[in-house]
């Protein structure tokens, strides 16, 4: 499901797909189908241990994407078919995490797509409560997210 390289396909040169939802505590905070009991702690980026040290941050994202980077070095195509954050993740946390994700995907020459363009993971009509939206032809545009996406 886009979280591990399929080793058996490597000799065949078949392109592979990765999902950029790691860690789920960021990407799926309060998403009923993942965070079923609302048990994920309030997200920060990076995610910190109780003592303030980094539990999950850019280094762990680098480790997560490294196997797909190795495929690219072998000339095997890779795309990130899904990324984004559910609309309950605080906007500033989402943007900081997404910046790291997109930077790493670019570093590995991996193309990407949002889970959805319009809706709870999207740049339009996401229904986030902590965004100052712009009107875009009758839709609510998240300009900060759009600017970040355009950077990559």
What are these regions (language model features)?
Residues 1-108:
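Extracellular glycoside hydrolase catalytic/binding regions
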Residues 90-152:
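Aromatic-rich peripheral "rim/lid" segments of glycoside hydrolase catalytic domains that contact
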